[in-house]
Amino acid sequence: LTLGMLFDPLSAALGAATGELVFSEIMLGQFGGLGELEKFLTVTIGVYIAGRMVKNPKNHVMVGVAALVGTAAQLFMGMLVDIAKVQFAVEDFEAVAGLPESVFATEGFAFANDLLFSGILFCLLPTLYLVPRLYGKIEPLLGMAPRTAESPVAGLNAKVCIVCVLGFACAVAAEMLASSGTPL
């Protein structure tokens, strides 16, 4: 999130998602093939949205809001995918046999728990500390100018929202195909 707010959000988002895929899935031997595309796309969308929201990286309030919104977007998309898998009978819900409606409560609680604990401890606090301190200091080391409010990558618009929705649709389709066992 920090790099998405300081540099080009799309490049940082793709790098963050690739790093998470390599270091938390492939190196640990937990790579799930097509199923990993859902996580890759939702992480990319979450970091990209957070990076686009920040126009002035010195504004602590906006940095904090963007960090929570980006994290919430990623977690919410994952929650929707999990609910859709149960509701469309692609995957069984083991918690309460015969009661697929209970997935709403279970996934909703998991979303709130992840957002309140992981979102604050591992996203909000480090981002609030790092972004204002690194802004204007790290960019010259890389031969770049610091982002300003006039930067073309600052702000959300309809085009960004449409691309994010299309990316999420691809994530849902990939996870549904992976969960149903459809070979490619």
Task: Locate each region found by the language model.
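Membrane-helix interfacial "entry" motifs
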Residues: 5-8, 31-35, 55-63, 104, ...
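Alpha-helical transmembrane segments and their cytosolic interface
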Residues: 102-184
